Design a protein with these regions (language model features):
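Gram-negative bacterial Sec-dependent N-terminal signal peptides
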Residues: 1-34
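Glycine-rich, small/hydroxylated-residue low-complexity segments
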Residues: 20-22, 29-503
């Protein structure tokens, strides 16, 4: 049989076109399906995140939210209310008749500050190729103002957008956000000035939202008060963190590091407290090369955290060669701590909300404390401890140190049946110590003697000798030291029971 080559070639071309057409349709269908699935995933992520907001604190609420979804993208608009809710009224205790009210009581019945509302708008582009990149979605965020709010924003930020953020969302739900706050400035002639160089922040979160990393940079801040001449200047601040928040933000673990180039405060005319004139000048304070490190862990259900703050500086004409402060908490029962912290954060009373002011807030907080007291007592079984582990200052080759820790030790189930104060007196533990150079005490006395607040410096050696004779302090070379310890219901001063000979 004779085969027509032309007809065969036409059939081949048609077959290839059909295959290509089918392939193109499949790709289009797959892309469309991927886009639709990406859009669904983004929307569900938004809903989950917004549902979590009111669970964090009583001071933040989602009051308006809309999500206009299209095929290739969506627009989300969310309004948050910051501050006390309008319906957060507290039970007000009985008050005196109007004739007996004084000014202080009238101030206590003042209502809380009006809440502030902030609106964010997110422009979302669905994947799988969102905004020219392979991602489930990209999101561009900005603040939204009404006419009045826009005018105020322009006074501070100029024509720049106050806040912008670009987020790339991965297919597993992880996201990376680059956020920028524009430089801001405000100056009122004869009053105050404010100049901030803005901030940049990158946040990375995994799909389960349990692991967070961030990097923050703030170039600087300059604030001044023309009336008092007071100024506050902050140099460049950088910070980074790597945290696990699978147990919630309250129990986030990991490490945070920060460095502040400088922090300077000066008040040459005082702080404005003196009536009818300038106040007494406050010595200028300059802190430099400040390093901050914080770490937190959870092991065997117990939470521990430490924080260290150190650097160099100058107060007036006195150079500080080194300062360091370390504090922390240990053996904090994680579940109990979270329950207490969540209840506190969710309490309108604890956040100062509701009518009735201070008295009503105190009454409501007492009710809250009574409810949480059993949980607080139960945490004592784990021998919790908090304190200032070390505060050290070096000046002119001399070093001063103070420290203290407070906690509970040896608590039994039987102990927990006792009232809270009885438990504290029996099982509470307190340790504190101080070491100061004698030279510093003499310098402090010389400064205070000018205003008659302290004895003259030449009397200081005699006063220290009297204190040593009575057992209140010890002399160790050029230093004066003191130690106090409370445990098992007894108090010791410098290693001796209080009331013993020499005390």
């Amino acid at each position: 049989m004779r085969v027509d080559p032309i007809h065969t070639k036409e059939k081949s071309i048609l077959s290839k076109k059909a295959v290509l057409g089918t392939l193109a349709a499949a790709i289009a269908l797959a892309y469309g399906g991927g886009t639709w699935l990406a859009g669904s995933k983004v929307k569900s992520s938004y809903e989950a995140a917004l549902d979590e907001v009111p669970k964090q604190t009583a001071l933040v609420r989602v009051v308006e939210r809309s999500y206009e979804r299209g095929f290739f993208g969506a627009v989300s608009t969310v309004t948050l209310e910051l501050g006390c809710a309008a319906d957060a009224a507290l039970q007000v205790p009985a008050v005196k008749p109007a004739a007996e009210k004084d000014q202080e009581e009238e101030e206590e019945t003042a209502t809380p500050f009006k809440a502030v509302r902030i609106t964010f708008r997110d422009t979302i582009r669905h994947g799988p190729f969102a905004g020219g990149t392979l991602a489930a979605a990209t999101i561009d965020s900005e603040l939204v103002f009404d006419v009045k709010g826009q005018a105020k924003a322009e006074q501070i930020f100029g024509k720049a957008k106050p806040l912008t953020a670009h987020t790339k969302m991965a297919f597993d739900g992880a996201y990376t956000t680059d956020l920028a706050v524009a430089p801001a400035g405000l100056a009122e002639e004869g009053k105050a000035r404010f100049a901030w160089q803005g901030a940049q922040l990158r946040i990375e979160t995994n799909g389960a939202r349990t692991h967070v990393r961030y990097d923050l940079t703030m170039p600087g801040l300059d604030v001044g008060d023309a009336r008092t001449g007071a100024t506050l200047k902050m140099g460049k601040l950088t910070s980074k963190a790597d945290m696990d928040k699978s147990a919630g933000w309250i129990l986030a673990t990991g490490k945070t590091e920060a460095r502040l180039d400088s922090l300077e405060f000066a008040a040459p005319k005082g702080l404005g407290g003196a009536a009818g004139g300038e106040g007494k000048a406050v010595p200028a304070v300059l802190l430099q090369d400040i390093d901050i490190v914080a770490e937190a862990t959870i092991a065997d259900g117990l939470y521990a955290s430490t924080g260290t703050f150190k650097g160099t500086g100058k107060i007036g004409d006195t150079k500080i060669d080194k300062f360091e402060m370390s504090s922390g908490g240990r053996r904090i029962h994680a579940a109990g701590y979270k329950k207490l912290a969540d209840a506190w954060m969710q309490s309108s009373a604890a956040n100062g909300c509701g009518k009735g002011g201070g008295k009503a807030s105190q009454a409501a907080m007492k009710v809250l404390f009574d409810q949480l007291a059993p949980d607080l007592k139960a945490m004592a079984k784990y021998s919790p401890e908090i304190g200032l582990d070390r505060m050290l200052v070096e000046i002119g080759g001399k070093r001063g140190e103070i420290s203290y820790t407070a906690g509970m030790a040896g608590v039994t189930d039987e102990d927990l049946q006792a009232p809270g104060m009885a438990l504290l007196m029996k099982r509470g533990v307190l340790k504190a110590s101080a070491r100061l150079p004698m030279q510093w005490l003499e310098q402090i006395a010389a400064t205070g003697a000018e205003s008659g607040q302290t004895p003259p410096p030449e009397m200081m050696a005699g006063l220290v000798a009297q204190g040593e004779e009575k057992g209140f302090v010890k002399r160790e070379g050029d230093d004066v030291t003191a130690q106090i310890e409370y445990a098992e219901g007894s108090l010791k001063l410098n290693g001796k029971p209080l009331g013993a000979p020499g005390q």
